[in-house]
Amino acid sequence: TVDAIDIIRSALIVVESPTKARAIAYFFGKPARRTINDFTVYEVASGQLILNVVASGGHIFDLTTEGGFHGVLKDEEEYIPVYTDIRRCSNCGEQFTDREECPVCGSRNIRSKRDVVELLRKLSMEVNKVFIATDPDAEGEKIGYDIYTIVKPYCKDVERLEFHEVTRKALRKALAEPRSIKLPYVQAQVVRRIEDRWVGFELSRRLWEKFKITTLSAGRVQTPVLG
């Protein structure tokens, strides 16, 4: 009936891990599945919502390695981080940006997170609402922010879910109390990522020059610990 059509709405829930996507879908019964370009999308009914649940697979974008100072441009007194899609080698699992072949094994069998971008765009056009349910920390907030920028042009109703345990009760509570993206968390993650990139790349370069071994690396966290 017309009333039923008005009441029943569809929503997309985006989490980080495929395991969590599956767990959430099974909270409400045995879900239907569909596969889009090797990604599994779960569909299940929950009250007045038809939920589509999918995983982003973690971060979608990272700082580029081309241009600026290790991916950060300087414009007078401003620093502008430049992001691009993350790529992963299907042979050895190495993660990188900006290259068409793996920097470790040389394989051209590469998966790009551009596939995730296209998936989220497609799914967001199919639903009335998008819930971003990435992890409740700074990393999760940055991933959530990136997802927001991807889906917002295609679905105007986008909100953030926060829950600290993967249970049906916690998810229902989060669905009843959605919030917006916490930009200070996003900004904190961006600053930390820039620090990681600057410190890690520069220290690693010096190690390569010193020991002539290009597989050595150093970073913001482990170097003070080792020191």
What kind of region is each of these model predictions?
Residues 1-193, 197, 202, 224:
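Intrinsically disordered, low-complexity regulatory segments
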Residues 204-227:
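Charge-patterned, long linear interaction tracts outside catalytic cores
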